[in-house]
């Protein structure tokens, strides 16, 4: 249930940039100090550093994206404002974890968050992307962050907790097959073809779940485009 983590990061990998959307729990804002609005800083009697300097430090100290193991991308701030936490259904919240015998926590009761949108532009499409969150002195994630990654709108994974480092191998031809090197950071529907065999008292039922894009490799479906199936094509 990482979608119930106090902090949420949605990472959108696009053709020429990475778009980072953050919901920062009100009690964890200090960890993301370089995103605190200038008005808030001035109210405390302190003059904030220039935005360019704060974004540079955010890119190197707080939320890092490293492409092809060598280039650290520079963040640009798009929007920072107060909001209420977005509701993300978690069917496991409140249930008992069979391994720990502890109740699975839901989202924080305090719904106040600092909402932030940032972009990290790049000039050439990278083959790998390493994601590094804010770290503690011991080298672990400083605060719990539930995260999800999309590449050109395709979910690369399900919600998971962001570890101290996560390396993603990118497939630009078909983002469905982009993969994290860590096995615990994967989508439940990992393959484009999944078969379910149901054995019941009076029947055996075989169900096949296949992506349209993979099915087109076997037969011509006569679809007009690659992104959408028109109503008339059903």
PLM features per residue range, with description:
Residues 1-234:
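N-terminal soluble domains immediately following signal/targeting peptides that reside
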